[in-house]
């Protein structure tokens, strides 16, 4: 693999909220922690100096990442409603955000697009469908209802997503994500409390049951779980939060997968770096109020609406700002609960943060012209009027203004320069000396 460079340049220190271009939103603390490990530096280590708009209840973390000034938001609660409210408030305080990245964890359709999707892989949104299943459990589940597909991404988002639908763009992003994942793991390893938090849980712990094999109590004749069938009979409430090892879920019903065999070989060769590298997929998210808990529901909705992953916040952020959802796979949305679920959640949060960070290396920075607020804050920082006047003169002019000025002169600039030369004292003196010298 060719060496891949990463961007760590420092952004100019912002003078106001208008200087922030990128927002990152996370629903859980573990997702926020993973993102913050990739922030190159923080602007609010000594307190928040940028404030927020009236009525905005968000708490912001500000810093820079890959040359961009960024603002990170941790939702007060997971879910669509909290995401929608937080994003609307974000937009009112940070009015110049050009891109919002919603990062975190998701449930995946393991055989979407005819491919094998594994735990720790990352899904990037190209579209989002909002769904509401009612109850997602076998007992009393309602028929699924889906709203219209949410608004089409704007050109800003579509242009960057199209790059990652190409083999070249996707491979480059994958290589960068691998580097940033190692960076997260290295930084976390320096802290005893979370030394192994983002460690790859291993291919043997990536377990997928057949879609028809429900998570319930087995070998319990007195339990209502014993009467369950695929038509929708009840399972007991206690089974929903119980580990597969305790319910008696039989590993004879596991699905074999070729990619896991490849990862196992890499691990046997002590090449964990290659084994943990996530694959990246671009496709449609399903966004609902709660997570899926039944594989047959997952597969039915996915097949009908071409969905490859499910999550719970995207519908709340999608239409508020230019948004890309980037989420790591932590479960298969089938209700099965593994003993190392927490490890997969942390690892998936890290892979998602790594892909989000890699994406920013390809996102073009927008030319910025100083806002009135920025100029006023600069004026306040310098008391000397001469300094203020000098700083104002140094502000870069706007190309549209320059174009208008040049068009209005209609070639006059050349004439003005010619006249200036002829009237210049140094030129006149030189000309007089030349004429005098010519007479001798």
For every predicted segment, state its role.
Residues 6-13, 385-440:
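N-terminal flanking helix/linker immediately upstream of nucleotide/cofactor-binding cores
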Residues 2-379:
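Intrinsic-disorder/coil detector with helix-boundary
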């Amino acid at each position: 693999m060719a060496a891949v460079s990463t961007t760590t340049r420092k952004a100019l220190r912002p003078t106001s909220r208008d200087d922030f271009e990128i927002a990152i939103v996370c629903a859980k603390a573990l997702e926020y922690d993973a993102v913050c490990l990739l922030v190159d530096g923080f602007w609010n280590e000594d307190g928040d100096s940028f404030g927020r708009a009236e009525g905005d209840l968000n708490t912001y973390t500000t810093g820079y990442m890959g040359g961009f000034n960024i603002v990170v938001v941790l939702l007060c609660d997971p879910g669509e409603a909290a995401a929608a409210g937080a994003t609307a408030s974000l937009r009112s305080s940070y009015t110049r955000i050009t891109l919002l990245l919603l990062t975190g964890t998701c449930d995946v359709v393991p055989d979407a697009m005819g491919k094998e999707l594994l735990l720790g892989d990352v899904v990037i949104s190209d579209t989002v469908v909002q769904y509401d299943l009612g109850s997602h459990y076998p007992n009393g589940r309602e028929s699924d209802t889906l709203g219209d597909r949410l608004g089409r991404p704007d050109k800003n988002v579509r242009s960057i997503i199209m790059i990652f639908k190409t083999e070249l763009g996707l491979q480059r992003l994958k290589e960068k994500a691998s580097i940033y994942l190692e960076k997260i793991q290295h930084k976390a390893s320096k802290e005893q409390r979370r030394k192994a938090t983002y460690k790859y849980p291993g291919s043997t712990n990536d377990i997928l049951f057949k879609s028809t094999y429900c998570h319930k109590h087995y070998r319990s004749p007195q339990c209502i779980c014993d009467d369950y069938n695929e038509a929708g009979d009840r399972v007991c409430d206690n089974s929903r939060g119980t580990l597969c090892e305790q319910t008696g879920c039989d590993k004879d019903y596991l699905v074999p997968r070729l990619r896991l065999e490849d990862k196992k070989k890499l691990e046997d060769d002590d090449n964990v770096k290659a084994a943990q590298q996530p694959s990246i997929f671009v496709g449609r998210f399903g966004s609902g109020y709660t997570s899926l808990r039944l594989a047959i529901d997952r597969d039915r909705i996915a097949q009908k609406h071409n969905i490859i992953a499910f999550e719970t916040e995207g519908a709340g952020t999608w239409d508020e700002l230019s948004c890309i959802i980037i989420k790591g796979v932590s479960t298969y949305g089938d209700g099965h609960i593994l003993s190392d679920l927490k490890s997969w959640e942390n690892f998936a949060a890290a892979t998602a943060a790594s892909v989000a960070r890699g994406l920013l290396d390809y996102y073009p920075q927008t030319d910025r012209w100083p806002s009135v607020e920025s100029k006023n804050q600069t004026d306040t920082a310098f008391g000397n009027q001469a300094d203020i006047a000098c700083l104002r003169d140094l502000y870069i002019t706007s190309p549209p203004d320059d174009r208008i000025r040049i068009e209005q002169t209609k070639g006059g600039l050349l004439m003005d320069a010619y006249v200036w030369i002829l009237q210049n004292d140094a030129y006149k003196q030189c000309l007089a000396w030349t004429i005098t010298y010519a007479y001798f």
